[in-house]
Design a protein with these regions (language model features):
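Predominantly cytoplasmic-facing regulatory/coupling regions of multi-pass membrane proteins
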Residues: 1-73, 130-236, 262-325
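Hydrophobic transmembrane-helix microenvironments that flank and shape a buried ionizable site
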Residues: 3, 48, 86, 110-111, ...
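Membrane-interface alpha-helices at helix entry/exit sites of multi-pass transporters
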Residues: 66-70, 84, 88-89, 98-115, ...
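Transmembrane alpha-helix interface/packing and boundary motifs in multi-pass membrane proteins
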Residues: 76-83, 229-244, 248
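Transmembrane alpha-helical cores of Major Facilitator Superfamily
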Residues: 77, 112-115, 233, 274
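Re-entrant/interfacial helical elements at transmembrane boundaries that shape
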Residues: 88-98, 241-256
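Hydrophobic alpha-helical membrane segments of integral membrane proteins
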Residues: 91-95, 107-111, 122-123, 239-241
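Hydrophobic alpha-helical transmembrane segments of ABC transporter permease domains
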Residues: 111-131
């Protein structure tokens, strides 16, 4: 159903706007834009991997930063290439959990790491949308009130008395409280988690601005920033096809509401999608190396087992067969 939702959004956009704006936007992609997007993606990937490494260490399933960077590139490629936009993160959590001997903690570390990044992104988006004019500026007081209520509720769950029941909900709540305190709010790591998340959001916005300029958008940066923030928030909706769907729909609506043209918004979103996919291609190399390595290890184990079996047979003493008189 989620994939169908993303396909429906794209179908509506193409029916109403045609594919001319999309094709024209893709034709503007140049070598410098790809290189710039790849450079920004390297910085954001390192910061994201650092955030994951800090959260995982707090939960007791530490991952070295070098390995975290490679795994994060791989998950970004899978997120960009597969429907839903989260399968790469699920794979990253499962793989790390198996390597660490605790799949549950591995998955939770990835989940909390992504949640921390999205929380910082929401806070920055609220600040930008409150300060700068945008098509949703008039709705921001109500949005801010809802956000404050959500924050107060989360603080109450974290700082309140832990439940003592034995139900599944009580156990899950106790685990979540312990994870947040150890993985996200630990005094030694919380500042680094927030700072790395800020750099990641800034990198995504920079990539969006690169895509906008590449697609021919000439609006001032201060006008583009609120639009970029809203499009980035739309990308967190898992109803997409490899990242495509809600991003293009929201971009087309926002650019039209801002007087920049829906076709321009569709072109910018399409260019952004291509730049992000191209910048994640190192993850494809990591995936291929991992797959080849696992295949070689499997062949080595099979050959070793066969050799041990032959050696065992060779060690069995030969018993002469008696001949009947």
């Amino acid at each position: 159903m989620r994939v169908l939702g993303g396909a429906a959004i794209l179908a509506i956009l193409f029916c109403r706007l045609g594919i001319g704006a999309l094709v024209d936007g893709l034709r503007t992609i140049s070598g410098w834009s790809l290189v710039a997007a790849a450079a920004v993606a390297f910085v954001t990937t390192v910061c994201s991997a650092l955030r994951w490494s800090l959260v995982a260490r707090g939960l007791g399933v530490a991952v070295p930063l070098r390995g975290a960077i490679a795994a994060y590139y791989r998950s970004q490629f899978l997120n960009s290439a597969l429907p839903g936009g989260v399968l790469g993160d699920v794979h990253r959590g499962l793989q790390h959990g198996r390597d660490a001997g605790d799949v549950s903690r591995g998955l939770r570390a990835v989940g909390w790491e992504r949640l921390a990044g999205q929380a910082v992104q929401v806070v920055l988006a609220l600040i930008v949308l409150l300060v700068l004019p945008s098509p949703v500026h008039s709705s921001m007081p109500a949005v801010l009130a809802i956000a404050v209520l959500c924050v107060l509720g989360a603080v109450g769950l974290i700082r309140g008395r832990p439940p003592r029941g034995t139900s599944r909900w009580d156990r899950a709540l106790r685990t979540a409280r312990a994870d947040v305190r150890a993985g996200l709010l630990a005094p030694r790591t919380r500042a680094a988690i927030v700072l790395s998340s800020v750099v990641v959001v800034a990198g995504h916005m920079t990539t969006f601005l690169i895509a906008a300029r590449t697609a021919g958008a000439t609006a001032p940066v201060l006008q583009m920033l609120p639009l970029a923030m809203l499009v980035l928030l739309a990308m967190t909706v898992p109803t997409n096809i490899g990242g495509w769907g809600p991003r293009e729909g929201v971009a087309a609506w926002l650019f039209a509401a801002a007087g920049l043209g829906a076709g321009q918004g569709l072109a910018v979103a399409a260019v952004y999608g291509v730049l992000v996919l191209a910048a994640s291609l190192p993850g494809a190399a990591v995936l291929a190396i991992t797959w080849l390595g696992s295949g070689n290890r499997g062949s080595t184990r099979a050959a070793g087992s066969q050799s041990e079996g032959l050696a065992g047979k060779a060690d069995v003493p030969h018993q002469p067969v008696p001949v009947a008189a």
